[in-house]
A protein has these predicted regions:
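Short, structured beta-strand/loop micro-motifs enriched in basic residues and often containing a Trp
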Residues: 108-115, 133-139
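Beta-strand/loop nucleic-acid-binding surfaces
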Residues: 112-124
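Short, flexible active-site-proximal loops enriched in glycine and acidic residues
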Residues: 98-105, 114-117
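Basic, glycine/proline-rich low-complexity segments that contact nucleic acids
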Residues: 4, 8-100, 121-200
Length: 200
């Protein structure tokens, strides 16, 4: 017996499908909504095959049990630094990444280079992005923390300038800007901790 999608899914919000409680196993169940994503192979140079170690160490002995098998996956190379300053880019597609919980976006920059970035929630194909000191305060733009208004939510934050984003990178995670000092910004982490990071 087939169950229609309308009966199965209660609602779709925030890229999540919530199932109706048709059985005890379905109650509170939700999965990522992949209907709005682009399918296809990643461009050459932005993908590579990672070797599966199947729970073995360098001596070949099993150190983690029950690992191995599964579907083969291609690793997408993500640009966490986004250091193409003052070069506008256009979002070509928003895609699923099997190695992370967040969706990723393929960006075509004006100089012809393509890169993957982490996709914020409302970023769509065709949107324009920019990394700049003077970037407008819009979704997908990247600018120093000192220019972001207090109370705003940010993601993919650098701990040290130039090292690439390392804070709030997984799906649904964000930090909140609490205060800006001379060279530092106070951020409220996803854990609730308040941390001081460089504002450049």
């Amino acid at each position: 017996m087939e169950i229609s999608a309308e009966r199965l899914y209660g609602n779709k919000s925030n890229n999540m499908k919530k199932y109706k409680p048709t059985s005890p196993g379905r109650r509170q169940m939700s999965v990522s909504d992949l209907s709005g994503l682009t399918k296809g192979n990643p461009p050459r140079g932005l993908r590579k095959r990672l070797k599966s170690h199947a729970g073995r160490n360098s001596q070949g002995r099993i150190t983690v049990r029950h690992q191995g098998g599964g579907k083969k996956r291609l690793f997408r190379v993500i640009d966490f630094k986004q250091n193409k300053l003052n070069i506008p880019g256009r979002i070509e597609s928003v895609e699923y990444d099997p190695y992370r919980t967040a969706f990723i976006a393929l960006v075509l920059y004006k100089d012809g280079e393509r890169r993957y970035i982490l996709a914020p929630e409302e970023l769509k194909a065709g949107a324009e992005i920019l990394t700049s000191e003077d970037a407008p305060f819009e979704i997908g733009m990247r600018t120093p923390l000192r220019r972001i208004p207090v109370g705003s939510f940010v993601y993919n934050i650098e701990m040290f300038p130039g090292r690439g984003g390392s804070i709030a990178r997984s799906a649904g995670n964000f930090a909140q800007v609490l205060a800006n000092e001379k060279n530092h910004t106070h951020l409220k982490m996803p854990s609730g901790e308040v941390r001081k990071v460089f504002s450049e």
